[in-house]
C-alpha cells in the first residue's frame, strides 16, 4: 500500500530532523479512500497508526491520490480545499500547522 510507505518515510524523515514539529502536539485523522489513518506529532517526534488510536485534533477527508499529491507538495492545501478535494473537520488552526509541516518536509 503506497500510503503506508508514504507515512513511514515521512515519519522517518521528520524524526531524523524534528525541527519542523518541535512545537506541535497534534493528532491528524486522515479519512482516505483506503481507510482511516492518524498522524501524531508530540514530544518532538512523529508517529502514525491505522484506525483511531488517538483523539484527533482535526480530521481531514481526502482521496488517496490527492493525499499523495498533498504530502509531496504537488497539491497545496488551500487549493485542495477550494477545489473540494479536501474537507477539514475540527481545528482549522491545526490543519494550517500541518500544511506548514508538509511544506517544511516536502521532498
Predicted regions and their residues:
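Feature captures hydrophobic
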Residues: 1-107
Amino acid at each position: 500500500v503506497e500510503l503506508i510507505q508514504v507515512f513511514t518515510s515521512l515519519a522517518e524523515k521528520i524524526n531524523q530532523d524534528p525541527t519542523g514539529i518541535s512545537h506541535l502536539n497534534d493528532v491528524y485523522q486522515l479519512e482516505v479512500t483506503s481507510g482511516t489513518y492518524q498522524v501524531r506529532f508530540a514530544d518532538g517526534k512523529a508517529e502514525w497508526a491505522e484506525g483511531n488510536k488517538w483523539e484527533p485534533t482535526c480530521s481531514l477527508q481526502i482521496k488517496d491520490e490527492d493525499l499523495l499529491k498533498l504530502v509531496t507538495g504537488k497539491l497545496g492545501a488551500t487549493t485542495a480545499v477550494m477545489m473540494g478535494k479536501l474537507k477539514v473537520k475540527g481545528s482549522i488552526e491545526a490543519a494550517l500547522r500541518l500544511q506548514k509541516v508538509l511544506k517544511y518536509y516536502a521532498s
